[in-house]
Curated annotation (Swiss-Prot):
Short motif GDS motif, span: 141-143
Assigned keywords, A-Z: Membrane, Signal-anchor, Transmembrane, Transmembrane helix
Family per record: Belongs to the PC-esterase family. TBL subfamily.
Membrane topology listed for this record: Single-pass type II membrane protein
Organism name: Arabidopsis thaliana
Motif DCXHWCLPGXXDXWN motif, residue numbers: 384-398
Keyword flag Transport: no
Gene Ontology MF terms: O-acetyltransferase activity
Location in the cell: Membrane
Bilayer-spanning residue ranges: 22-42
Residues of the signal peptide: none
Identification of the protein by name: Protein trichome birefringence-like 9
InterPro entries documented for this protein: TBL (IPR029962), TBL_C (IPR026057), TBL_N (IPR025846)
GO cellular component, one term: membrane
């Protein structure tokens, strides 16, 4: 064998080895890239496959805010979304019991929310109670927040055989009580609380020597003084918005204060944005990002027709959800402010979520209290097209709250 032949064979062997190693390297590189893509693109799928809860898991991300209302195959006046609680629930304020006060139709109870592209996990009261054992679930906001709180109380109590065990820690009655209410589930050592704070920030007297037209001020840079009670909560659901309008602020002599100075030129939505910045600072400074699951619920739509709440607006003729999307109101401007602030917080507190219920609620013009007020209410009192009959629409909000907690592996063992 001459030198040329030896060189050719060596070259061939060398090239073959290179190609072999190159093929193996390319195969391993491809496998690595594929694995990385799967991890990055489908983290929720990975979580669903590798973790489990005592009841169920959500295996993929879902936008529960988009979908449609569908009529259930079978229902009754005491069954909402299969939860089986009715107006007899002792945790309902009398003002939310529409049938008790004369509403005859029950069709508004016959609907369930169906998200696009996925299913809403069935609410499991026993599971949520067990996950929340030795904990606190806290609602903070206006009376629409109370609407949601009472809904959750009734939903959770269905898993308790002896409901008389559940009690208010200070002995306060639910009906007609304003302010702070804390209901204890003794077997789970769990409290489910409502704290009234329509603005979330402080509202009080104006600074000394303020003009006479300034009766009160909303201090947009000072968080609610009762907020120290909320520290350490496991789940917090905030809401605000219905008091952020001119009717309930500047037209009543309530102006906005910042840095201990009243700013009479500050607009309502500018003030709302500043108050959310104050809320953001409190959450990031006072809450443990490893423990507290924080939600800010979006704006709950109103459905006054032929007027506003104080000009004869009505909704008592509505008995079914809206079916024409073209008739829906545009998204509330409040939501844009809320969403933006939450996005700013994610890098420091990953357990902060936007509980978006506006679009699905916009369809439900049929679910309001309307004229079915408590006995003794004056006939001249405007219809209530803001609050909701219970059982009713807020039950769906709590189903979505539960689904989002599942997707976040809330207190998974």
């Amino acid at each position: 064998m001459d030198h040329h032949q030896l060189f050719s064979l060596c070259s061939f062997s060398y090239i073959f080895k290179i190609k072999k190693h190159l093929f193996v390297s390319l195969f391993l590189l491809s496998l690595l890239i594929f694995s990385t893509v799967v991890v990055d693109v489908m983290p929720s799928l990975r979580i669903g496959l590798l973790s489990s809860s005592s009841s169920q898991t959500v295996t993929k991300e879902c936008d529960y805010s988009k979908g449609k209302w569908v009529r259930r195959a079978s229902s009754s006046s005491s069954s909402v979304n299969g939860l089986f609680y009715g107006e007899e629930c002792r945790f309902l304020d009398s003002g939310f019991r529409c049938h008790k006060h004369g509403r005859k139709d029950s069709g508004y109870l016959d609907w369930r929310w169906q998200p696009h592209g996925c299913d809403l996990p069935r609410f499991n009261a026993s599971d949520l109670l067990e996950r929340s054992r030795n904990g606190r679930i806290v609602f903070v906001g206006d009376s629409i927040g109370r609407n949601q709180w009472e809904s959750l109380m009734c939903m959770l109590s269905q898993a308790i055989p002896n409901k008389s065990e559940i009690y208010e820690v200070n002995g306060n009655p639910i009906t007609k009580h304003k302010g702070f209410l804390s209901m204890r589930f003794p077997r789970e050592n769990l409290t489910v609380e409502y704290h009234r704070s329509p603005f979330l920030v402080v509202i009080g007297r104006p600074p000394d020597k303020s003009p006479k037209e300034i009766k009160t001020t909303v201090r947009v840079d000072e968080f609610n003084w009762q907020s120290k009670r909320w520290v350490g909560s496991d789940v917090l659901v905030f809401n605000s918005g219905h008091w952020w309008n001119e009717d309930k602020t500047v037209l009543t002599g309530c102006y906005f204060e910042e840095g201990r100075k009243v700013n009479k030129t500050m607009g309502v939505m500018e003030a709302f944005g500043k108050s959310l910045k104050t809320w953001k600072s409190w959450v990031l400074e006072k809450l443990d990002p490893d423990k507290s699951y924080v939600f800010f619920r979006s704006y709950s739509p109103v459905h006054y027709r032929n007027g506003t709440w104080n000009t004869g607006g009505l909704c008592d003729a509505e008995i079914e959800p809206e079916t024409d999307k073209r008739k829906l109101e545009p998204d509330a401007s409040h939501n844009e402010y809320i969403y933006k602030v939450i996005e700013e917080m994610r890098y420091r507190h990953s357990k902060v979520k936007f509980l978006n219920i506006t679009y699905l609620t916009e369809f439900r013009k049929d679910g309001h209290i309307s004229r079915y007020r408590e006995q003794g209410t004056s006939v001249d009192v405007p219809q209530d097209c803001s609050h909701w009959c219970l059982p009713g629409v807020p039950d769906t909000w709590n189903e979505i709250l539960y689904a989002q907690l599942l997707s976040m592996n809330y207190r998974t063992k």
